[in-house]
A protein has these predicted regions:
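General small-molecule cofactor/ligand-binding pocket signal
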Residues: 21-25
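Residue-level signal for beta-strand positions within conserved beta-sheet cores that form or flank
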Residues: 18-20, 64
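Intrinsically disordered, low-complexity regulatory regions enriched in Ser/Pro/Gly/Thr
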Residues: 15-18, 124-126
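Typically the conserved alpha-helix immediately C-terminal to a functionally engaged Cys/Sec
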Residues: 1-16
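Cysteine-centric redox/oxidoreductase cores and disulfide-bonded domains
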Residues: 26-180
Length: 180
């Protein structure tokens, strides 16, 4: 389902995907009335509009956007011309619907959603990617899988899933390593 990424590592911990409400907002800045992207210019913005369209086209699947993004990053430099088709299929999305959304106009199009995402980032003071919020609070430090998983499990008030014990094991190993 997922590639080898931070989100994959966390969500594959047993039961953790069931306690997480995952939302991604691509980071961009606003220049007059349009979004621009820092790291990869127009190509990064294009990828982000497609990812937002994946989210829009499968609103009941919070992980569709991640599946699309992970496929896209996994194919960078190899299948760029085919990424929309390949990655839409990987996330069980219709490539024509993806293209229509990503190249459309208006607030519900890919570019319109990217502009809204940039406005949200600005309003929250976000200026670096990734910036992670858990229950509305910004996670301090580098979001590694162990510290992010631990923060998620610590914030969860219900019965902890088995995957949370792996966060504790990772934290104990870190503490043990520091004692040596």
């Amino acid at each position: 389902m997922f590639g080898n990424t931070l989100a994959t590592e966390i969500l594959s911990a047993e039961g953790v995907a069931d306690i997480v409400s995952l939302t991604q907002h691509p980071l961009a800045r606003i220049n007059e009335s349009f979004a621009f992207c820092h790291h990869g210019g127009w190509y990064e913005c294009d990828m982000q509009t497609h990812a937002l369209c994946a989210k829009k086209l499968k609103p009941s699947d919070p992980f569709a956007m991640y599946e699309y993004i992970e496929c896209n990053f996994g194919n960078l430099g190899k299948n760029d011309a085919d990424n929309t088709r390949l990655c839409a299929a990987n996330a069980t999305l219709d490539k024509d619907d993806m293209w229509k959304c990503a190249t459309g106009y208006g607030p519900d199009s890919g570019p319109g959603m990217l502009l809204k995402s940039a406005q949200l980032a600005d309003s929250m003071g976000v200026n670096a990617a990734p910036t992670v919020f858990i229950n509305g609070k910004e996670l301090q430090g580098v979001p590694t899988a162990p510290n992010l998983l631990k923060a998620i499990c610590d914030a969860y008030t219900g019965a902890k899933p088995k995957g949370c014990s792996s966060a504790l094991v990772a934290e104990e190993k870190k503490i043990e390593k520091c004692r040596r």
